[in-house]
Amino acid sequence: MLATLIIGLREGLEAALIVGIVAAFLKRSGRSLRPLAIGVAAAVLLSILVGVLLEALQTALPQSQQEALETVIGAVAVVFVTTMILWMRTHGRDMHHQLEARSEAALGRGGSLALAGMAFLAVLKEGFETAVFLLATMQAETSGALGLLGAVIGILAAGALGWGLYQGGIRFNLSRFFTITGVFLVLVAAGLVLNVLRTAHEAGWITIGQRQMFDLSWLVPAGSIRAAVITGV
């Protein structure tokens, strides 16, 4: 639950910031917010559909193929979170200016339709990453219901924070927030790597190094917060 909550909060706030920056630009320009709303709504619905389809596909597959699909999804999630953290460290400070420039270019190029498309692609990227990352993390959770609950709480909290930032009623250090959550996401990614190795073994893709050398499970009691942080799941 802790991992999915952090993922939902971080990814949700990134998406909320994108929407808020573009909305503020449109408001200052005296433009309608309708194209933005249409693009965002379409991206959110498509992201949810991707997650549902991946989960349905995995459930319909035989056990060995389920493990193979879990391995692929987990590996993709690790790549996503790694590139996301690196991108935020190098481009996070310029995100505001980049989005405003892209919004202005979209309006000049194709008006409302181009802006809706830009908003759709920007939010879809975040939504697709979130869907894959949450699915991979929930596969490693002992309780799927708790994992889903954590994701919902994180996304709702991100939406509330994003709205507060847009309205100007909430102010906090975004750089520090993304740094702290980035550390937790590195731990989550490390846990996903372990889960990818496990599912790859169960799928028959890895057949070496299977002998247990020692057991340190007593250091991280199952279900504890310490276990969630240390194992990344």
Name each model feature, range by range.
Residues 1-233:
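Multi-pass alpha-helical transmembrane bundle typical of ion/small-solute transporters
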